[in-house]
Amino acid sequence: MKSLTAVCQTGASGMPALNASGRIQRHPTHRGDGENAEMKMYLSKLKDLVPFMPKNRKLTKLEIIQHVIDYICDLQTELETHPEMGNFDAAAALTAVNGLHEDEDSDMEDADAEAEAEVDPDILAQRLNAEQPAKVSSPAARLPLTDRQTPNTLVAPAHPQQHQQQQQLQLQQQQLQSQQQLSNSLATPQNAEKDSRQS
């Protein structure tokens, strides 16, 4: 009998280990289980929000995050290239949103009285749009992921000259990188020829 308990205590027989009182030891609970479950929930939501996410295989957390970032960059590119973007004033929009939130906080008691009174349709539409949660569009209506070639900027520079200088600087950096890659690729065969001559 002692050999049986010795085997059980080491766990070599596949049976659970026994403690000193002869009871089965349970595995301690993991502290990160709640956090892990919450992270899985958020990753699952992200997978549902981003279109063209591979469904036929299990994705790592990093792959999911990369797809999300790529999709956000694509949306930002589309926003930047939208024809109305030139007419958009980000500072005025932010000021209007902040003013709307301040008005909602200070006038919460008066909201019931105003609702009964006649309200301007434009103001009503603005409030409804601000209060509605963002609707999730169907995956078919979303844009596909592509490689991003432009910098990650939301608002165009204030001066056109700065924008032009930034583009020229980026072009120079790309040319320098391509030249370095070319010189590295040319240097490798030359080194191989030298090594073969020496031997």
From Swiss-Prot:
Modified residues (Phosphoserine): 106
Annotated TM spans: none
InterPro entries: bHLH_dom, DNA-bd_prot-inh, HLH_DNA-bd_sf
Gene3D superfamilies named in the record: Helix-loop-helix DNA-binding domain (4.10.280.10)
Region called Disordered, residue ranges: 127-199
Role of this protein: Participates in sensory organ patterning by antagonizing the neurogenic activity of the Achaete-scute complex (AS-C). It lacks a basic DNA-binding domain but is able to form heterodimers with other HLH proteins, thereby inhibiting DNA binding. May sequester proneural proteins in complexes inefficient for DNA interaction. EMC also affects vein differentiation. Inhibits the activity of AS-C proteins by forming an non-DNA binding heterodimer.
Protein name: Protein extra-macrochaetae
Source organism of the structure: Drosophila melanogaster
